Amino acid sequence: MLTLPESLRDAFKEPLGPVTIDADELLAAAAETRGERAAPDAPIIAVGDVVTYHLREAGRVPDVALIDGKTERETVDAEIGSALAAADDRRLSVENPAASLSAELLEALSEALSDADPVIIEVTGEEDLAALPAILAAPDGASVVYGQPGEGMVRVAVTPESRTEARELFEALDGDVEAAYKALGRVPDGDR
């Protein structure tokens, strides 16, 4: 549905938020954002196996987790793979090619965000670009957490400002952006 053009690859290397290696610090910042935005139930969305694992190890099961069994295109180590496989969260399985956002992934993300219980979206392919639609679909006060290769975890506080930045990148992808918004259950200019 949407693909990352070669000309935009560098734009996606810059983190969309602060980077940390401390899951407890990240969770404290997420709680602060929920308080500031008067959104005590705002979700935490984790994009990536290692990020999901670290949040779970810190005692916070992500409301939505997107995993693909890989980190930096290599299979995650056995400890992480086993821990995530043992999680008893509801699971959705989708296919999503590398450097892409499939309708299947976008629809699953929308469905998972509407579920009151934690959901793991298991991706065959890659989930690397999923932070963008997660930022667009999540409510104000949510946190989207993804891995920054070689650096740590990036936390994006979902606000109108971060949604605008994500929207600009999302709309710069190649493909049918209107259909992608529809699959995500959003209108192009609509903040939550």
From Swiss-Prot:
One example of a Gene Ontology biological process annotation: coenzyme A biosynthetic process
UniProt KW keywords: Coenzyme A biosynthesis, GTP-binding, Kinase, Nucleotide-binding, Transferase
InterPro entries named in the record: GTP-dep_dephospho-CoA_kin
Known EC number: 2.7.1.237
GO molecular function: GTP binding; kinase activity
Pathway note: Cofactor biosynthesis; coenzyme A biosynthesis
Residues binding GTP: D49, V50, V51, D68, K70, E127
Catalytic activity as recorded in UniProt: 3'-dephospho-CoA + GTP = GDP + CoA + H(+)
HAMAP family, per the entry: Dephospho_CoA_kinase_GTP_dep
Function in brief: Catalyzes the GTP-dependent phosphorylation of the 3'-hydroxyl group of dephosphocoenzyme A to form coenzyme A (CoA).
Protein name: GTP-dependent dephospho-CoA kinase
Organism: Halorubrum lacusprofundi (strain ATCC 49239 / DSM 5036 / JCM 8891 / ACAM 34)
